[in-house]
A protein has these predicted regions:
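Conserved "landmark" site that anchors the functional core of diverse proteins
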Residues: 1-246
Length: 246
Protein backbone atom coordinates (compact mmCIF):
# COMPACT_ATOMS: atom_id res chain seq x y z
CA UNK A 1 0.00 0.00 0.00
CA UNK A 2 1.01 3.59 -0.48
CA UNK A 3 -0.38 7.11 -0.09
CA UNK A 4 -0.77 9.68 -2.87
CA UNK A 5 -1.94 13.28 -3.19
CA UNK A 6 -2.70 15.51 -6.18
CA UNK A 7 -2.27 19.29 -5.99
CA UNK A 8 -1.68 22.22 -8.33
CA UNK A 9 -3.98 22.76 -11.30
CA UNK A 10 -7.75 22.41 -10.93
CA UNK A 11 -8.08 18.87 -12.33
CA UNK A 12 -10.73 16.21 -11.77
CA UNK A 13 -9.22 13.38 -9.72
CA UNK A 14 -10.76 9.92 -9.83
CA UNK A 15 -9.55 6.87 -7.93
CA UNK A 16 -11.08 3.61 -9.14
CA UNK A 17 -13.68 5.71 -10.97
CA UNK A 18 -14.77 7.68 -7.89
CA UNK A 19 -14.30 11.44 -7.68
CA UNK A 20 -11.85 12.32 -4.92
CA UNK A 21 -10.60 15.59 -3.46
CA UNK A 22 -7.43 17.41 -4.40
CA UNK A 23 -4.99 18.57 -1.71
CA UNK A 24 -5.74 15.39 0.28
CA UNK A 25 -3.77 12.19 0.77
CA UNK A 26 -5.43 8.98 -0.38
CA UNK A 27 -4.53 5.37 0.44
CA UNK A 28 -3.93 3.08 -2.55
CA UNK A 29 -3.47 -0.66 -2.83
CA UNK A 30 -2.27 -2.98 -5.56
CA UNK A 31 -4.46 -2.68 -8.67
CA UNK A 32 -6.03 0.67 -7.77
CA UNK A 33 -6.19 3.21 -10.60
CA UNK A 34 -5.78 7.00 -10.68
CA UNK A 35 -7.26 9.20 -13.40
CA UNK A 36 -6.63 12.93 -13.85
CA UNK A 37 -9.02 14.92 -16.04
CA UNK A 38 -8.38 18.13 -17.96
CA UNK A 39 -7.51 21.17 -15.88
CA UNK A 40 -10.32 23.70 -15.44
CA UNK A 41 -7.71 26.27 -14.45
CA UNK A 42 -3.97 26.25 -13.97
CA UNK A 43 -1.23 24.64 -16.05
CA UNK A 44 0.40 21.94 -13.94
CA UNK A 45 -0.93 19.26 -11.59
CA UNK A 46 1.38 17.45 -9.19
CA UNK A 47 1.15 13.80 -8.17
CA UNK A 48 3.01 13.08 -4.93
CA UNK A 49 3.62 9.62 -3.51
CA UNK A 50 4.79 8.66 -0.03
CA UNK A 51 8.55 8.20 -0.03
CA UNK A 52 8.89 9.54 -3.57
CA UNK A 53 9.31 7.67 -6.84
CA UNK A 54 12.16 5.23 -7.27
CA UNK A 55 14.48 6.98 -9.74
CA UNK A 56 18.15 7.75 -10.08
CA UNK A 57 19.11 10.85 -8.13
CA UNK A 58 21.32 13.62 -9.48
CA UNK A 59 22.71 16.12 -7.00
CA UNK A 60 20.26 14.84 -4.38
CA UNK A 61 17.20 15.20 -6.62
CA UNK A 62 15.24 12.75 -8.78
CA UNK A 63 13.77 15.55 -10.91
CA UNK A 64 14.17 15.14 -14.67
CA UNK A 65 15.87 17.85 -16.77
CA UNK A 66 15.93 16.55 -20.33
CA UNK A 67 17.87 19.55 -21.62
CA UNK A 68 20.82 18.62 -19.41
CA UNK A 69 20.46 14.87 -19.90
CA UNK A 70 19.44 14.30 -16.27
CA UNK A 71 16.90 11.49 -16.09
CA UNK A 72 14.58 10.25 -18.82
CA UNK A 73 11.11 11.16 -20.05
CA UNK A 74 8.36 8.86 -18.77
CA UNK A 75 7.08 6.52 -21.47
CA UNK A 76 3.58 5.12 -21.89
CA UNK A 77 3.35 1.84 -20.00
CA UNK A 78 6.45 2.51 -17.93
CA UNK A 79 6.34 1.30 -14.32
CA UNK A 80 7.61 3.51 -11.51
CA UNK A 81 8.29 2.18 -8.04
CA UNK A 82 7.34 4.16 -4.96
CA UNK A 83 7.52 3.86 -1.20
CA UNK A 84 5.06 2.03 1.00
CA UNK A 85 2.93 3.90 3.51
CA UNK A 86 0.20 3.17 6.03
CA UNK A 87 -0.27 6.82 6.97
CA UNK A 88 -3.66 8.17 7.97
CA UNK A 89 -5.31 10.23 5.23
CA UNK A 90 -4.77 13.95 5.77
CA UNK A 91 -6.04 17.07 4.01
CA UNK A 92 -4.87 20.63 3.53
CA UNK A 93 -7.25 23.09 5.26
CA UNK A 94 -9.36 24.77 2.58
CA UNK A 95 -8.37 28.24 3.77
CA UNK A 96 -4.68 27.36 3.25
CA UNK A 97 -4.98 26.08 -0.33
CA UNK A 98 -3.35 28.48 -2.85
CA UNK A 99 -5.89 30.15 -5.12
CA UNK A 100 -5.44 30.11 -8.88
CA UNK A 101 -6.45 33.62 -9.91
CA UNK A 102 -6.78 35.00 -13.47
CA UNK A 103 -4.43 37.81 -14.52
CA UNK A 104 -2.24 37.69 -11.37
CA UNK A 105 -0.29 40.73 -10.22
CA UNK A 106 3.30 39.62 -9.56
CA UNK A 107 5.32 41.46 -6.94
CA UNK A 108 8.85 42.50 -7.94
CA UNK A 109 11.93 43.71 -6.09
CA UNK A 110 13.90 45.89 -8.47
CA UNK A 111 17.61 45.27 -8.87
CA UNK A 112 20.22 44.01 -11.27
CA UNK A 113 20.70 46.67 -13.94
CA UNK A 114 17.71 48.71 -12.75
CA UNK A 115 19.71 51.94 -12.91
CA UNK A 116 20.41 51.37 -16.61
CA UNK A 117 16.70 51.28 -17.53
CA UNK A 118 15.08 54.64 -18.25
CA UNK A 119 12.16 55.88 -16.19
CA UNK A 120 9.99 55.49 -19.30
CA UNK A 121 11.02 51.83 -19.68
CA UNK A 122 10.17 51.15 -16.03
CA UNK A 123 6.80 52.87 -16.47
CA UNK A 124 6.02 50.62 -19.45
CA UNK A 125 6.97 47.49 -17.50
CA UNK A 126 5.00 48.29 -14.34
CA UNK A 127 2.09 49.95 -16.16
CA UNK A 128 1.32 47.26 -18.74
CA UNK A 129 -0.17 43.80 -19.01
CA UNK A 130 1.85 41.02 -20.64
CA UNK A 131 0.64 37.78 -22.19
CA UNK A 132 2.32 34.44 -21.50
CA UNK A 133 4.01 33.18 -24.67
CA UNK A 134 3.61 29.73 -26.22
CA UNK A 135 7.41 29.49 -25.98
CA UNK A 136 7.39 29.36 -22.18
CA UNK A 137 8.65 26.28 -20.35
CA UNK A 138 10.18 25.21 -17.04
CA UNK A 139 13.33 27.17 -17.88
CA UNK A 140 11.55 30.49 -18.14
CA UNK A 141 8.33 32.28 -18.98
CA UNK A 142 8.48 34.48 -22.07
CA UNK A 143 6.06 37.39 -22.09
CA UNK A 144 4.57 39.35 -24.98
CA UNK A 145 3.54 42.97 -24.62
CA UNK A 146 4.73 46.54 -25.10
CA UNK A 147 8.46 46.56 -25.84
CA UNK A 148 10.65 47.68 -22.94
CA UNK A 149 13.69 49.69 -23.99
CA UNK A 150 16.59 47.45 -22.96
CA UNK A 151 19.96 49.01 -22.06
CA UNK A 152 22.50 48.65 -24.86
CA UNK A 153 26.16 47.72 -24.62
CA UNK A 154 28.07 44.58 -23.73
CA UNK A 155 28.18 43.20 -20.20
CA UNK A 156 29.59 40.16 -18.48
CA UNK A 157 27.28 37.25 -17.73
CA UNK A 158 26.42 36.90 -14.06
CA UNK A 159 24.50 34.53 -11.82
CA UNK A 160 20.74 34.24 -12.12
CA UNK A 161 18.12 33.51 -9.47
CA UNK A 162 14.61 32.09 -9.35
CA UNK A 163 12.31 34.80 -10.70
CA UNK A 164 14.99 36.92 -12.38
CA UNK A 165 13.45 39.27 -14.99
CA UNK A 166 15.63 39.52 -18.08
CA UNK A 167 14.97 42.03 -20.86
CA UNK A 168 16.59 40.97 -24.17
CA UNK A 169 17.10 43.39 -27.09
CA UNK A 170 13.57 42.77 -28.45
CA UNK A 171 12.13 44.29 -25.26
CA UNK A 172 9.97 41.27 -24.38
CA UNK A 173 10.73 40.22 -20.77
CA UNK A 174 11.64 36.70 -19.70
CA UNK A 175 11.09 35.50 -16.12
CA UNK A 176 13.48 32.68 -15.20
CA UNK A 177 11.99 29.68 -13.41
CA UNK A 178 13.11 26.37 -11.87
CA UNK A 179 15.09 24.99 -14.84
CA UNK A 180 16.81 28.32 -15.56
CA UNK A 181 20.40 28.58 -16.70
CA UNK A 182 22.91 29.41 -13.97
CA UNK A 183 24.26 32.58 -15.62
CA UNK A 184 22.88 35.13 -18.06
CA UNK A 185 23.99 38.30 -19.80
CA UNK A 186 20.71 40.06 -20.61
CA UNK A 187 19.97 43.20 -18.55
CA UNK A 188 17.92 42.39 -15.46
CA UNK A 189 15.20 44.70 -14.19
CA UNK A 190 14.52 42.86 -10.94
CA UNK A 191 13.26 39.62 -9.44
CA UNK A 192 9.70 38.32 -9.07
CA UNK A 193 8.94 37.54 -5.43
CA UNK A 194 9.56 33.82 -4.85
CA UNK A 195 6.07 33.50 -3.34
CA UNK A 196 4.56 34.65 -6.66
CA UNK A 197 6.58 32.60 -9.15
CA UNK A 198 4.20 29.63 -8.90
CA UNK A 199 1.34 31.91 -9.98
CA UNK A 200 3.22 32.70 -13.17
CA UNK A 201 4.15 29.05 -13.76
CA UNK A 202 0.45 28.08 -13.51
CA UNK A 203 -0.56 30.60 -16.20
CA UNK A 204 -1.52 29.11 -19.55
CA UNK A 205 -0.26 30.58 -22.83
CA UNK A 206 -2.25 33.72 -23.59
CA UNK A 207 -3.00 34.47 -19.94
CA UNK A 208 -2.08 37.98 -18.83
CA UNK A 209 0.04 39.13 -15.91
CA UNK A 210 1.15 42.48 -14.57
CA UNK A 211 3.83 43.59 -12.13
CA UNK A 212 3.99 45.64 -8.94
CA UNK A 213 7.18 47.03 -7.41
CA UNK A 214 7.83 46.34 -3.72
CA UNK A 215 10.82 47.02 -1.49
CA UNK A 216 13.28 44.40 -0.28
CA UNK A 217 11.98 44.94 3.26
CA UNK A 218 8.40 44.29 2.13
CA UNK A 219 9.52 41.13 0.34
CA UNK A 220 11.32 39.89 3.44
CA UNK A 221 8.25 40.52 5.61
CA UNK A 222 6.03 38.63 3.15
CA UNK A 223 8.40 35.65 3.11
CA UNK A 224 8.63 35.59 6.92
CA UNK A 225 4.84 35.69 7.21
CA UNK A 226 4.45 32.84 4.72
CA UNK A 227 7.13 30.78 6.46
CA UNK A 228 5.44 31.24 9.83
CA UNK A 229 2.08 30.22 8.35
CA UNK A 230 3.60 27.02 6.95
CA UNK A 231 5.31 26.18 10.23
CA UNK A 232 2.01 26.59 12.08
CA UNK A 233 -0.06 24.73 9.46
CA UNK A 234 -2.21 21.96 10.93
CA UNK A 235 -3.42 19.28 8.52
CA UNK A 236 -6.90 17.89 8.93
CA UNK A 237 -8.21 14.37 8.78
CA UNK A 238 -9.07 13.23 5.24
CA UNK A 239 -12.50 14.45 4.18
CA UNK A 240 -12.26 17.56 6.36
CA UNK A 241 -10.36 19.67 3.84
CA UNK A 242 -9.10 19.61 0.30
CA UNK A 243 -11.02 20.61 -2.81
CA UNK A 244 -13.53 18.34 -4.53
CA UNK A 245 -13.64 18.46 -8.33
CA UNK A 246 -16.11 16.90 -10.72
Amino acid sequence: DTTVAVTGADVALRINGRVRALWCSHRLGRGDSIELGHAESGMWAYLAVAGGFGAKAFFGSTSVVLREGLGEAIQTGQQLTCGESTETEWAMPRESIPLLVPAPVLRVTEGGQKAEFSAAARDVFFGSEFAVSQQSNRMGCRLNGPAIASPSGERLSEGTTYGTIQVPPNGQPIVLLNDRQTIGGYPKLGVVLSLDCWKLAQCRPGATVSFKSITVEEAQDLVRTERAARENLTLRRGGEGGVQQG
